[in-house]
Swiss-Prot record:
Protein name: Leucine-rich repeat neuronal protein 3
Segments forming domain LRRNT: 23-69
Side Extracellular, residues: 23-626
Cytoplasmic side: 648-707
Primary residence: membrane
Expression (tissue specificity): Expressed in the brain, in Stronger expression in the ventricular zone and anlage of thalamus, spinal cord, and dorsal root ganglion in 11-17 dpc cerebellum and cerebral cortex in adults.
Residue span(s) of domain Fibronectin type-III: 523-614
CDD domains, per the entry: FN3 (cd00063)
Residue ranges of the TM segments: 627-647
Gene that encodes the chain: Lrrn3
Amino acid sequence: MKDTPLQVHVLLGLAITTLVQAIDKKVDCPQLCTCEIRPWFTPRSIYMEASTVDCNDLGLLNFPARLPADTQILLLQTNNIARIEHSTDFPVNLTGLDLSQNNLSSVTNINVQKMSQLLSVYLEENKLTELPEKCLYGLSNLQELYVNHNLLSTISPGAFIGLHNLLRLHLNSNRLQMINSQWFDALPNLEILMLGDNPIIRIKDMNFQPLVKLRSLVIAGINLTEIPDDALAGLENLESISFYDNRLSKVPQVALQKAVNLKFLDLNKNPINRIRRGDFSNMLHLKELGINNMPELVSIDSLAVDNLPDLRKIEATNNPRLSYIHPNAFFRLPKLESLMLNTNALSALYHGTIESLPNLKEISIHSNPIRCDCVIRWINMNKTNIRFMEPDSLFCVDPPEFQGQNVRQVHFRDMMEICLPLIAPESFPSDLDVEADSYVSLHCRATAEPQPEIYWITPSGKKLLPNTMREKFYVHSEGTLEIRGITPKEGGLYTCIATNLVGADLKSIMIKVGGSVPQDNNGSLNIKIRDIRANSVLVSWKASSKILKSSVKWTAFVKTEDSHAAQSARIPFDVKVYNLTHLKPSTEYKICIDIPTVYQKSRKQCVNVTTKSLEHDGKEYGKNHTVFVACVGGLLGIIGVMCLFSCVSQEGSSEGEHSYAVNHCHKPALAFSELYPPLINLWESSKEKRATLEVKATAIGVPTNMS
């Protein structure tokens, strides 16, 4: 019982002490500020409840003169503080200091010697212009430093000496023009570096080599045009890198290979024009790839993304010119689950592209100008369990009979199994003006089944085949034409032709060099009738102009009383012979060739032709048949004599010269319909396939007694 009063006195004493401390703490809290316990995460993402003094947005001109002794987090954001007096006493346990959005012009105005326990310092959106030598030397425990959105143009080589525990450094949105690797010598533990939105002229080899523990690097928005091959050398722990919003025209393939443990790659918003073979290959740990918002991206070529065994997601969206993805573009990606291809210029996506992705779970191709034909018919054949994202936004824009319909609602049987090539309008512009001696690259891509072959025609009429180099020209296998050191002589109209067994498509571009193209003062067009039959006319033409447009239009008119039946076909630019078939016997035709020039003028020539009667054609056939039999008999006789001579003769060399007989055969008609008459080319090699161009025939006055 005697102990009871003692216990009461002890409890009363503790209560009084606590009350006094609370009163003292309340008294120490700066006027208008809020002092309370708040949740906080350390730079290592460790949760704690910290004693916080919140003086944000109070218009303070000076640092608070007095703070609670146990203050851990001090928030002074959005004030007008210009300096911190050296006589200021800082709480000994201060771990977080936020001075962002103030008027600090120099780090030397901050007495850091008394803040040795600081873990995080926020100085963004001040007026700092430089970081001098050892300016933060006293902050040996600092783990986060935010100096972004200032006016920094100079950082001394030893500015970060003493910050050997720093984990995150934000230098983005300043005025830095170069990166000095000496900055990083004092930062052996740095894991995150932000350097974006600085007018950095270039990155050098080994720029980041001292940062052996760096995991994330952001170099966004600094107008980089190239990345040196060894720029990322030494960063063996780098997992994430962002080149967002730069001016890269191609993937920095060699440099990326040096980041052997890279997991996340952001190349968004760069003017890369195509993803080439091997651009993303053998990156064994890459999980996500971003190639969005690329204004110049036209195609993803064969084996562009290859052997990425851990890749889970590809994002290639909002690319206004991306019109072609090769069937083998994505290869050896066993874990890819998500393929985002929406809001591009894709008219189709090959089934082979999807078949090569065994683990694909979702795909997004909505908001593309889908052509509902043979290439896309696999979508509705119920051969896939892949989830289509936003299927209600997936519409056909072509052909006209399906325009506006949802792709998933068009039955696959309504789409042909084979179809004409289609060169995407976005592949390359219709005209281009370049300076002399510059480099020109034109990307021509087409979709079709069977897959089309692509070649180019120069203004002088030369045919440039894939994988061939000719003078200043080189055509890649995918269809890209390169012209090195172009001069006014090479100016003019270039035409890409895509052709398969079904037909062809073509697209032209006018290239001006120094604002002009070669003049054509003596261009002419001549038509010659080479053969006339009862049901056909074989015609040839010759154009001397160097810069004729490739889409020649041929029209054949037949005068009838009540008929205007037109035939049409497509003829290649470099074919100058055509057999107009399905004509009526004993009928007068007017055959015209109209060739527009690059100056929006046209050269047109017409000839009148009357087809032979059936009786006359029969006599011709009999006469020709007799001559043919006689020729064959004579030929057989000659062959017999030669064989006899060969048997009698005992001499001969097995190494003698071989002779070859060339047989020029007429090609069979393309039997799509009567609107596509057979094409005859007497000089074409059987291994070369030609594009075709539209030809029209209009019948007008067939005699009434003709059937």
